[in-house]
Amino acid sequence: EITAIAWAWIRPNPIVSCYLLGESAAHDMLTAFVAAYKQADLVTGHYIRGYDLPMINGALSEYGLPVLDDKMVQDTKIDLVRRAGLSGSQENLGSMLGLHHPKVKMDQTKWRDANRLTPEGLTLARERVIGDVLQHIELRQRLLALGYLCPPSLWSSGNPHQPEAVYTP
């Protein structure tokens, strides 16, 4: 189950959209995200191809909604230059690069509170997902400036009813 979802358009002073289960119905959270996703030429996140987009597709499927369309994606974990001896976690990269936005820590107990929709848990979940978005925006900008990110690539849900998108540089 998706307890919280957040996103922002990358611009100076981004405004983060955030939805929490318990405050919004899951269907409404998903349709709001999909509407923003469809407007974007490119989406970016930390392990977004490996976790976030597949997780959202699972939730969309559970609610009988169409899965996500193909999209150009830049993933600050998967698209990070090859390296050894260095964790690729967003928290570690943020610390190493001295980012202004810190990683909001949530251990399993705090996530369980959020998943149980307790007021305290939802407050923490909101802080976490908004913090993740803001830190990610800063992280991506820094990684791009340093030349540490590979180019975006096409992500596909594998939807057989959607014509395959073709990327032409």
Give the label of every model feature segment.
Residues 1-12:
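Acidic, metal-ligating active-site segments
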Residues 4-6, 34, 108, 152:
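Intrinsically disordered regions, especially transient/low-confidence alpha-helical propensity segments
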Residues 14-96:
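Conserved DEDDh/DEDDy metal-dependent 3′-5′ exonuclease domain
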Residues 93-163:
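Acidic, Mg2+-coordinating catalytic module of metal-dependent nucleases/exonucleases
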Residues 169:
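Cys/His-rich short segments
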